[in-house]
Amino acid sequence: MKQRFLAFSLFCMALVFRLVAEGGPSGPAELPPAPPVRGVALVITGAAARIPQEAALLEALDERGLLKDLSFISGDSSGALNAVAVNAIVSGRMTWARYRQILEGLHNSDVFVQSGKRLPVDTSPLRAMLKRVVEGEMGFRTMGDLPIPTSISITRLEDLGLEKTAYRMCSERINAESDPSLSIVDILMASTAIPVVFPAARIAGVTTIKDIDYVDGGAGEDYVPYEAILEFEAARNLAFEKVFIVSRKSNTVPEVSEELRALGVNDRGLFDKLGISPERLASRLFLKYLAQLARQAPGLADRTFVWRPDFQASFLLLDFNSLGAQYAATQEWAQASAPVPLLQYLSEARSP
């Protein structure tokens, strides 16, 4: 019995000496260090012919020095076009004055032509313009040519209505679908392909996604394309100091019939009389995805700001003949306005 007690005592002493030598018993497992917080990210939603509204807000952000440390951009549809323009401007390849001149010089015929009253329209003029401006003037041929990491959202037409539909085509490999070697014009044509109105587009040489037709990413789950930011943060192990979500104004009255008339379709005002308003739906979707961001990434939401015009004038979504007036109206409105913190925006339910 004494021998057993002595052996047990020696074992306990040895264990104590070992613990002391190793610094004592280990405490709770340490949490991994928080990723560094730095840089600014932009999220630019779709806008169709209201593209100059977003451009004017982006110029105002730049003038106020809020894009000095711009590190990532995510956009879809017209927001994708503005994302590429910001790349050109921040890198010194183009000025805001030149970009505004391009927008103000556009007309419907520079974007689409229509045979009779058939939909979708022919967007070959848009492709020609993008090749001239994006490839020729800005010097961007592939996604990898963009100096700022940039994601452009697209979706498959057959996937519309499903939950997971977005493909976030980034200039850097942050996800499975990104391929920096792809044509930037092809991706822009897909991202601006408004379902029904504009034809779906195919992207040449794809290997990371199916070789099929694609449409506007904003028509799927990326109505507010913020998730690319989460993917970029995870891939680069960082957190952005600030995020600005820039969008366009939503009109407050039904204008479906007027939009259709611009495309040669006369519904005799039926949709407007019924009060059918895609604008109200768009506003609800905007708030829905902002609320989703707040729930999904509360830390990021605390550092996110929303800027969306709210002036008196109304402009049609498919009227590319009024871009100059839109730029001027938004620029004037922005002088007395500032981006609103996301949580404040949601609490005030700023839905036009």
Segments the model singles out, each with a brief description of its role:
Residues 19-28:
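Non-Sec secretion/translocation targeting segments of pathogen effectors
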Residues 35-43, 48-136, 164-177, 181-188:
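Patatin-like phospholipase
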Residues 46-50, 78-80, 159, 219, ...:
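Solvent-exposed loop/turn segments at secondary-structure junctions
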Residues 1-4:
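Positively charged n-region of N-terminal signal peptides that target proteins for export
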Residues 30-34:
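A short, basic/flexible loop-to-alpha-helix module at the beginning of a structural domain
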Residues 41, 116-246, 299-340:
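Active-site-adjacent alpha/beta core region of enzyme catalytic domains
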Residues 7-18:
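Bacterial N-terminal signal peptides
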Residues 234-239, 245-307, 328-352:
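Terminal low-complexity/disordered tails
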